[in-house]
């Protein structure tokens, strides 16, 4: 019994440091919100202006790595000896499901407004040129380039899982080929794992901070309940309690069903928006935006704006590249696990084509709808943001559609389910990563899962208390900095080990 308790207990060296670090940062922030905002602005400015170029080069180098995998010596190598675990259709559907989070619904609905009102390349705000580039930039930030970087890491993790038969729940275990077993399991590996966990906690808290206001604004629209910070906190608390009940009562099957419902409802809601908002315009705008993307792609890839200093690449491109970096390990582990039995080329092409199609559909439909509503003066997004906040502006883009009550109910259910599954996934991932020798498929301890969901909820509330998007953007960028190096080390470790052990 003692051995079993030890086996399923927490791993102190990766449990307590992230808990203490995040706890102290939350306490300091709540203690003085104004001072915290000053620090946040300073951190954001320093990282994006001084080191933004590094994130851009990281994405470009990883893109070349994708081409090397697709056309290089490992292209036909199979990730495991078994046939593919899922059919190609199911595999692609599972990829799409991973893209339909509430945070994605947040950015997909409002991102184009920011690109048009504060455009790149010195364009006039709200001009024709700004509108032509609006969706093109969304397709750039959520298109083949970032998914290609995830492909490389997914191949790396799939190689360690299915070829080398390694149990990987933290990144340090993949670094043995690069730094040796002594360092990977010693202080160096512990530091790497703690960087990963702190960044992941902030990323998940950020996603919760984006998702919660959408649900509470829906509640205000549907039920007339005023949206306040207290309501946000109550809703987050309810999600944590619901997650605890699901885990304690063995309702994980219900959570998985909810995840499937989320995916199907996403298809339904996107189809509805596509039909009623203007299918012809959406297809024309998408086609034109692909052309604009191809025309401006070299500039977008390397745009740092050092002369004009307009701030667009720092505020958006660097932010989004940090977003992709911070979620890379967690997402790549998931994508690797569902790709057993596929070749390297299949995985790389499947991810880039399938996931790009998913994100492009989301951003095209939601972004085009927002642009149409702005052009027709149906909603005034600047006034809505100034008076009520970003979440209200997003809600109004949905409420302006025909059959508004039914549409809002659909959006409310979608956001609620998406956030329930988010909290569940957060608690599971963090508990798995901070427990001792919990194997894949096993359940980590209940109290550990509840504890992490509470901490993630607290971070979400703190970010909401700070107000605005800058704290959320800064949390992502600050967390992305250490993972920038961790991702590179995982990649190099895979290349070194594959060169030695993955021969014909």
Curated annotation (Swiss-Prot):
Catalytic activity from the UniProt record: 4-(trimethylamino)butanoate(in) + (R)-carnitine(out) = 4-(trimethylamino)butanoate(out) + (R)-carnitine(in)
Matches recorded under InterPro entries: BCCT_CS, BCCT_transptr, BCCT_transptr_CaiT
PROSITE patterns in alphabetical order: BCCT
Alphabetized UniProt keyword annotations: Antiport, Cell inner membrane, Cell membrane, Membrane, Transmembrane, Transmembrane helix, Transport
Subcellular location, principal: membrane
Membrane topology: Multi-pass membrane protein
Pathway assigned in UniProt: Amine and polyamine metabolism; carnitine metabolism
Gene Ontology MF terms: (R)-carnitine:4-(trimethylammonio)butanoate antiporter activity
GO process terms (BP): 4-(trimethylammonio)butanoate transport; carnitine metabolic process
Localization, UniProt: Cell inner membrane
Sequence intervals crossing the membrane: 10-30, 51-71, 92-112, 143-163, 195-215, 231-251, 263-283, 316-336, 347-367, 398-418, 446-466, 475-495
GO CC field: plasma membrane
Stated family: Belongs to the BCCT transporter (TC 2.A.15) family. CaiT subfamily.
Protein's job: Catalyzes the exchange of L-carnitine for gamma-butyrobetaine.
Subunit structure: Homotrimer.
Protein name (Swiss-Prot/TrEMBL): L-carnitine/gamma-butyrobetaine antiporter
Protein species of origin: Escherichia coli (strain ATCC 8739 / DSM 1576 / NBRC 3972 / NCIMB 8545 / WDCM 00012 / Crooks)
Biological classification of the source: Bacteria, Pseudomonadati, Pseudomonadota, Gammaproteobacteria, Enterobacterales
Gene transcribed to yield this protein: caiT
């Amino acid at each position: 019994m003692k051995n079993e308790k030890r086996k399923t207990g927490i791993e102190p060296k990766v449990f307590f440091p992230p808990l203490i670090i995040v706890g102290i940062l939350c306490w300091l922030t709540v203690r003085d919100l104004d001072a915290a905002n000053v620090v946040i602005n300073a951190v954001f400015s320093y990282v994006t202006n001084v080191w933004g170029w590094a994130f851009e080069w990281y994405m470009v180098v990883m893109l070349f790595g994708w081409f090397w995998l697709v056309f290089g010596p490992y292209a036909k190598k199979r990730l495991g000896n078994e046939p593919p675990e899922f059919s190609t259709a199911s595999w692609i559907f599972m990829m799409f499901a991973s893209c339909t989070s509430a945070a994605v619904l947040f950015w997909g609905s409002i991102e184009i407004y920011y690109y048009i009102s504060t455009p790149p390349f010195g364009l006039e705000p709200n001009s024709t040129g700004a509108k032509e580039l609006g969706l093109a930039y969304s397709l750039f930030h959520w298109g083949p380039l970032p998914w290609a970087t995830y492909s490389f890491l997914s191949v790396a993790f799939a190689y360690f899982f299915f070829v080398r038969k390694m149990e990987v729940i933290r990144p340090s275990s993949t670094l043995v080929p690069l730094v040796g077993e002594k360092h990977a399991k010693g202080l160096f590996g512990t530091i790497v794992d703690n960087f990963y966990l702190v960044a992941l906690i902030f990323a998940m808290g950020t996603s919760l901070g984006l998702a919660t206001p959408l649900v509470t604004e829906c509640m205000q629209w549907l039920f007339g309940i005023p949206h306040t910070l207290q309501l946000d906190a109550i809703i987050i608390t309810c999600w944590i309690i619901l997650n605890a009940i699901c885990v304690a009562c063995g309702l994980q099957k219900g959570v998985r069903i909810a995840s499937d419902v989320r995916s199907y409802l996403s298809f339904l809601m996107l189809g509805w928006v596509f039909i009623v908002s203007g299918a012809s315009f959406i297809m024309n705008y998408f086609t034109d935006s692909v052309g604009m993307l191809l025309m401006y792609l070299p500039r977008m890839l390397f745009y740092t704006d050092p002369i004009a200093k307009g701030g667009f690449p720092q505020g958006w491109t660097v932010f989004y590249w940090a977003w992709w970096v911070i979620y890379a390990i967690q997402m790549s582990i998931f994508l690797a696990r569902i790709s057993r039995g596929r070749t390297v080329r299949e995985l790389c092409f499947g991810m880039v084509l399938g996931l790009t199609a998913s994100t492009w559909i989301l951003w095209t439909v939601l972004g085009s709808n927002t642009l149409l509503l702005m052009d027709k003066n149906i909603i005034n997004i600047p006034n809505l943001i100034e008076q009520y906040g970003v979440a209200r502006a997003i809600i109004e883009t949905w409420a302006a559609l025909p059959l508004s009550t039914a549409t809002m109910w659909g959006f409310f259910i979608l956001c609620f389910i998406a956030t329930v599954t988010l909290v569940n996934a957060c608690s599971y991932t963090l508990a798995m990563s901070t427990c001792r020798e919990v194997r894949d498929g096993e359940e980590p301890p209940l109290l550990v899962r509840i504890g992490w969901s509470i901490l993630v909820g607290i971070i979400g509330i703190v970010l909401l208390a700070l107000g605005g998007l800058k704290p959320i953007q800064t949390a992502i960028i600050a967390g992305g900095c250490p993972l920038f190096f961790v991702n590179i080390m995982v990649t190099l470790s895979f290349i070194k080990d594959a060169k030695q052990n993955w021969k014909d």
